[in-house]
Amino acid sequence: MPKTRKYSTVDEEKILKVSLSLATKEDVLEWSHGEVTKPETINYKSYKPERHGLFDELIFGPATDYKCPICGKKYKKSNEGLTCNNTPQCEIEKPEILPKISRRSRMGHIALQTPVVHFWFFKIDNSIISKLLVLRVGESNEYVSKNDLENIIYYKSHIVLDNGGLKSLPKNKIININNAAQIYKDALIELRELNLNDADALEIIDGTINHLNDIVGSKVGNDYGVDFYELNEVIEEYSSAKIQTGSKAIEFLLENIDLEEEQRKIKSKIKEINNLEKTSSSRKQDLSKLYKRLQVVESFINSGQKPTSMLIYNLPVIPAELRPLVQLDGGRHSTSDINELYRRIIIRNNRLRKWIELNAPTLITQNELRMIQEAVDALIDNSKKKPKPVTSKDNRNLKSISDALTGKKGRFRQNLLGKRVDYSGRSVIVVGPELKMNQVGIPREMAAKLFEPWIIKELIDQEITLSVKSARKLIDNLNPIIWPHVAKVIQGRPVLLNRAPTLHRLSIQAFEPVLIRGKAIKLHPLVTTAFNADFDGDQMAVHVPISDEAVREAKELLFANRNILGPKDGEPIINPSQDMILGIYYLTIEIAGAKGEAKVFQDVNSMLRAYEEGSVSLHARVAIPFKKLQKTFNLKGDKGYIFSTVGKFIFNQAFPENFPFIFDSSVSSISDAQEYTKKYYIPYGLNIKETIQNTPINDALSKKDLSKIIRTIFDKYVPVLTKEDVASVINDVNHTNYKDTSTKFANLVTTNKTALEYIHAESLSKFTTKHFVDVNKKLSLKTPGNPNQPIWEVDQYVELLENVWFDYVNIVASVLDEIKDLGFKFSTKSGTSISIHDIEVSDNKKERIKEGDDYTSELKSMYREGLLTDDERYSLTINKWSEVKDNIQNDLKKIVKNNPLNPIFIMMNSGARSNMANYVQLAGIRGLMTNNTKILKSDAENERVVRSTVEIPVKSSFLDGLTAYEFYSSTHGARKGLTDTALNTAKSGYLTRRLVDVAQGIVVTEKDCATQNGFVVKDIVDNKTKTVIVPIRERIEGRFTIEDVKDKDGNVIVEKDTLIDAKMAEEIVEVHDVKEVNIRSILGCEAKNGVCQKCFGKDLATSRIVSIGEAVGITASQSIGEPGTQLTMRTFHSGGVAGVEDITGGFGRLTELIDAYRSPWGRPAIISKVDGIITEIKTPKDKNTNLVYITYLDQDDASQTEVVSVPKNRTLRVKVGDKIVKGQKIIDGPIILEELLEYGGPRKVQSYLLKEIQKIYRMQGIAINDKYIEIIISQMLSKIEISEPGDSDFIIGSLVNNLDFYNTNNELLEKGLEPAKGKVVIHGAKRIPLLSNSFLAAASYQESAKILVNSSISSQQDFLVGVKENIILGKKIPAGTNSQYESKSKFDIRDPKEYFKDKSPQRHYKIEMDNEVSDMFNEFRISQNK
């Protein structure tokens, strides 16, 4: 693609890279279509743009399509690009015929009378100009500061550019109002000495000196200073000195800088400092400054740009439509702030031109020059302008160009990363229990608007109306004639539903629209969990995918029935809840001695009839001959019976025939169906009644049991073939073999390279037979001739494939729909209701409370006697009341167990609503309440007792009613809960945004990176409590091994490069008791620009190996950020002590880790700097410290001792004789990450971060997979700071991606050159996006100006690797269906017609038919086609 710096209409997909560089004055003229010389906008009478003004139609394009801006003649579209010659004026001006959209792209310019320094280059990132120049005053050690340069730019100070041999005027000396008189005086005296022989010169110089002396002592001199310009003139007249101010001075300095020489000097200074044996902190600062300066200098050298490009000579005027003037009612106008800022520049520029022409006094001209500089500054970045920004009449800061870029409402985030979408609507949602899982109810009126173009086409095709206009009128008037056509049009056109906030990818899913009356969208009740929706007024947005590719993506990837598992932990996210659970629980309750118990029915239908007649109870256990049940039991003997409750027989009808029968809640054992069923099998001849009565009652199925059943169904019926595989069988189906396809399906190989299980082949065969008959029937109605065997074309094969494929992938969803229907039906039938009398209370409550009161009064008397401190008394009181509440809770648990049919307990036990904690407050005691306290960092550091709990508990329950004091006491906690939730939501959203920016570019890019770096995993254990946080079994499942896994005897259990599934993981851990496994990990992956399949392992949302093209980085960020709202902000108090433990849970600690804080909350841990053995722990007398002695071997294998001093009041984590490794804690507390990195190395930091982040989430009961946290951690440690560049092109002090670093070093070593040296550095999530290789991605995150400034001076190129930069350009993102995916993978969503290329519509395949007429008819059709 040709390189262009002009606005161009290029196909986005052809853009390969974008570069950003400084615009020269020639560039601006090339962009411009004319100079703006007047500050006017539009004429107040005619409302037409003024000529040469800010909205001039000749410069910026016409306000009306294809209309000449001069004579007003209208042209056709075909004349676009020509010029109008209608009038003599037109012939002179040559106006181009253009559409009005050109006003969004055509630019103008203002030719400034003086160059202006670009605001960003002396204000942003500590002034690029200042870093570049670093001016030294003469031969002294004094340097020109950043502020001095600013004073020059704003004409407050002057600078000596050339001393002309005058010693009193050293080069680069700054002359300001304070020191001017003395400097000029010394200079004039020296000048006098040099001009003793020139009488005229002496006279003028003496006169000037006398005048200077007069002014210095006078009031005028003190108030206004000296006249710089007059004195400069005299000095410049009689010497070759040069003193200047303003942008001209800066221009001179930038023109005369020798970049190569500067580069050489900086490098030698760096070498000098590095060669010193000891470097002090001030030297380190100098080094840091030199590195930064070197980067700026090398940026200019490498990009080949001139430093003077940082000055503005011609100021671009952005297109008129991007700074619009909007007409309001009443003849008033509202204008964009940018127009006001441009007007100020034009007015000042015109005035300056006038002063120059009139040869006005220098002071007046100088003032105008300063004002122009300030006006351009305000246009570029008004918010940073000092002393105060330009304001409007109502004292509001005007929005400049920088302000329009940054922030949530800026160009990047408002217009480029998020756009408004056509063909969309939104409405309130209501529940739609009658819908199938892949359906959504769309209001008719909404559908008529959303699908308008398709409806118009259909109406015209059916000759209901003849024109688009009349069709649109029918739709707008909602004419009843349109509804059948609306229903026809929406068939096979899915819609996307989105609920804000879109916290994870399941917040957008696709559904098939179903027309409904009313104005609310009907949502399927099972998908509410994924959307986090409820029906209390939530709204949802609907979008219509338009292109064929988008429709296929929606059906294959976004359909709700394809998103059963949640990506964060791989568990089903589509689980029945509330009413449905209550219904299923009620349906599966067993009651001994219920009506009709032990009855025998001949089959399920006769049992159902008896139930409907009321002769048998739903909860009675009855028997049915097992031969009559359509279930595969694999039991010997054929005359026995199966017994269960009527309800369970009904419940089991929801499952496929080849799914085991569910008898009880031991769901995990149904995989071994034979053993499981034996318990409920009565062999022929046994007494049925006795057997049933002697069998213990089973618990009903609760929420947890249902969850396990759904997981089992998913694992059993999830599609294991690709669409291409199914198409290969359907391609051979015809009228003779359509009933017998099971063998062909059974011969297919699954995606896991195993043989297809029989249940899959059987299901597919059944679907094929069913749909073949349907499609054939449909076709025979259309086809005359032989109606039984019509000729199939490619469309019929596609239809058959689509129907069979949909049924195959919908098996799990259809079972869930059945469960949902049963749940709703039987929760209604149960008639569950609760009353105040259903709340059962404990008889022991008063005794328990009395016990607490007695204990606390005893503590008070001990405190009064001085046996306890107040803090100890408080802590013991809190502990006692917690114990009392626990005892009352245990009493209530017994009551719940003894009354299983109480409606409240049914709700609790089933998991439909509420839990024990709620019931304790309802029927027992409310307990302790939170207090209004703030924990300070000093409290945590000094481990003070913080009284965050009111020590007098609320002794009443809600059933008793609270006293006035108790009610007041509980208000603080109740309000805190609500405010915390609100604050948490915002914080969690911001965290997700930061994480997405960190990981957005990480996509699965290749199969295998062949890395040798594994990651050893074992149980994550909380060392304090010795509890397992994440078991090893969970950590290794779904990961590849990097080496053979062996048992204790050295026998190989799992070979290298094997994906560990759930069974293997169980075998490794439970059977062979392996404690640690070396696996492939993202932390060791060497794939460029992403990760490889083997290092990532299993995709949790599909339970298969992750597909190439999967945007795992964004999934990871969403998985960590989405549950963020559930993380508490409250801190856990162990007996009220504000220690480190307070923050181990909750949001604060998570932010602290992810942002890599330098000083974590609480007192940090002390870690070992060496690998050794603890030989001694001493406590010196009269000291508050312990001395820990560690013996270790140094580099020469000599024994050394390291003494670590630790505070006495801290918990030691080591004892004498312990082995200790680098980075291990000596005392408790949070570890400082940078310290751990320095002593323990990157691997230790990775393990520590992983453990700590998992700890935070698991404490709240949230399961997140390791691999997502690994992605974020790998990004945090992905940069290397260069200390010595060797023979590479790296710049000292720069940050380089670790893979680039290692690859460059390998290349250098192969060539025998010196490699670069550097150290790994850790960055928090706030910093990482700013270090991105893509300037577009970085600038759209934060600090836009700084990123753009640094990118432009180095002429940086963005190769569009990540997701964000492609979205900004409007390109397809390099992930998913636009990635280099493999054939037959998740993203291989091609047009189904491609599977039937041999069945093209042009050639009909004559199927053998008996009917002669049909033969003739077909021959005729074939000859016609030929």
Curated annotation (Swiss-Prot):
Q: Name one GO cellular component term.
A: DNA-directed RNA polymerase complex
> Which organism was this protein described from?
Mycoplasmopsis pulmonis (strain UAB CTIP)
Has the keyword Zinc been applied to this entry?
Answer: yes
Q: What does this protein do?
A: DNA-dependent RNA polymerase catalyzes the transcription of DNA into RNA using the four ribonucleoside triphosphates as substrates.
EC number(s) of the enzyme?
Answer: 2.7.7.6
Q: How does it assemble?
A: The RNAP catalytic core consists of 2 alpha, 1 beta, 1 beta' and 1 omega subunit. When a sigma factor is associated with the core the holoenzyme is formed, which can initiate transcription.
List, alphabetically, the InterPro entries matched: DNA-dir_RpoC_beta_prime, DNA-dir_RpoC_beta_prime_bact, RNA_pol_asu, RNA_pol_N, RNA_pol_Rpb1_1, RNA_pol_Rpb1_3, RNA_pol_Rpb1_3_sf, RNA_pol_Rpb1_4
- List cystine links: none
Residues given in the record as Mg(2+) binding sites: 534, 536, 538
Cofactor comment: Binds 1 Mg(2+) ion per subunit.
HAMAP family according to UniProt: RNApol_bact_RpoC
Extract the SUPFAM superfamilies matched here. beta and beta-prime subunits of DNA dependent RNA-polymerase
The answer to whether UniProt assigns keyword Zinc-finger to this entry is: no
Family matches, as CDD domains: RNAP_beta'_C (cd02655), RNAP_beta'_N (cd01609)
Out of the domains of life, which is the source?
Bacteria
Name of the featured protein: DNA-directed RNA polymerase subunit beta'
Catalyzed reactions: RNA(n) + a ribonucleoside 5'-triphosphate = RNA(n+1) + diphosphate
Q: Which cofactor does it need?
A: Mg(2+); Zn(2+)
Which sites bind Zn(2+)?
Answer: 1009, 1085, 1092, 1095
In Gene Ontology terms, what is a biological process of this protein? DNA-templated transcription
One Pfam match, given by its short name, reads: RNA_pol_Rpb1_2
What family is this protein classified in? Belongs to the RNA polymerase beta' chain family.
A Gene Ontology molecular function term of the record: DNA-directed RNA polymerase activity
Keywords from UniProt, A to Z, are: DNA-directed RNA polymerase, Magnesium, Metal-binding, Nucleotidyltransferase, Transcription, Transferase, Zinc
